[in-house]
């Protein structure tokens, strides 16, 4: 079975948060393979103006305090951003038919994606029962770390880092089933 790590960059914290970008990588949680990747910027005007998603001022202010590289990637991405519907269709096309999705926190990324797919009237491209949560693994292994590559709060860089963290944690916990 193929696994995918998904990360979102958003302009809010609720299930209706506008999605600024989506990053995803295919990976083997019990090995060291990280495969094909996906990265797309989402037009915030599409999220808010067309689909009624809700910007959170606290999150916008939080973004202003992030690194120059993260802020510039977010701004530059809006120039070539896809509509929410186009971005979700592209993510669905990227994912294998039978996939186990992961994210850092099940109550954040998965909730926002489920809401977004529902808004654009597209089916969720995975079975919700297969959703996996990195935050739980990190809680069981709080001292395990992986060297960070890339830009913090870049959806693709974060997805790669999170996939490597799952692999690292499961190497030290071979009895855990993913």
What do the predicted segments below correspond to?
Residues 116-120, 140, 168-172:
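Active-site catalytic microenvironments for nucleophilic, acid-base chemistry
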Residues 125-145:
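Short, flexible loop segments at boundaries between secondary-structure elements
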């Amino acid at each position: 079975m193929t696994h995918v790590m998904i990360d979102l960059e958003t302009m809010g914290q609720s299930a209706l948060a506008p999605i600024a970008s989506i990053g995803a990588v295919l990976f083997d949680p019990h090995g060291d393979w990280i495969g094909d990747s996906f990265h797309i910027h989402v037009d915030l005007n599409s999220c808010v103006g067309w689909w009624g998603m809700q910007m959170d001022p606290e999150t916008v202010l939080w973004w202003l305090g992030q690194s120059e590289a993260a802020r510039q990637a977010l701004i530059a991405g809006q120039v070539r951003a896809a509509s929410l519907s186009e971005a979700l269709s592209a993510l669905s096309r990227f994912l294998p038919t039978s996939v186990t999705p992961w994210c850092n926190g099940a109550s954040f990324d998965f909730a926002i994606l489920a809401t977004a797919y529902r808004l654009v009237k597209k089916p969720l491209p995975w079975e919700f029962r297969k959703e996996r949560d990195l935050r739980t693994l990190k809680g069981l292994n709080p001292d395990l770390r992986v060297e960070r590559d890339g830009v913090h709060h870049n959806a693709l860089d974060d997805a790669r880092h999170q996939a490597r963290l799952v692999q690292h944690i499961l190497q030290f916990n071979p009895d855990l089933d993913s």
